[in-house]
């Protein structure tokens, strides 16, 4: 795996590991960051497949392109787009799989992001998502600070019940939780010190302590069923 991709990864899971990606698939990675999941997906889809990485930060797109080159995959069908996740400008029914690794919780309009994922998927296409949710509510002022000082996979996280409601209201069915993990204090501290502080500064120690035992990483898949 290219070092640039590993150094810039803020992921909380490995969605390509449970997405059942097959040779020839078209995969779109929401919030591709430094490109780690794009590289992994490209190996799985093979020369006949296609991978598109979407990210809102031009700096990350450039680093993801570097990761693809370092992995020797520059001749594969890999594309990067600098755009918001809810405005990919990809055609309807474009992808077999949409992946995302601890990014959607950072988006202010999660409904629009999941609606966009649903739109670009083919019938029987699937999402494979790793993300962060809250197992307990936290104080509004603390939540607000997360959105401005904690990009380490936590800013914008919402209660788990609200998260599943968002996924289903976008049209997805057969939601299957692959894994759930309550983050330990050590993991929370690691997120606070994760790469990317040139974009967002880390939170205070007091804020980290305040959310201990309330933050969960989830991995799940869901299906876009064909119209009857």
Residue spans of the language-model regions?
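C-terminal lobe and adjacent flexible extensions of AdoMet/dcAdoMet transferase-like proteins
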Residues: 170-228
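Conserved SAM-binding loop
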Residues: 64-65
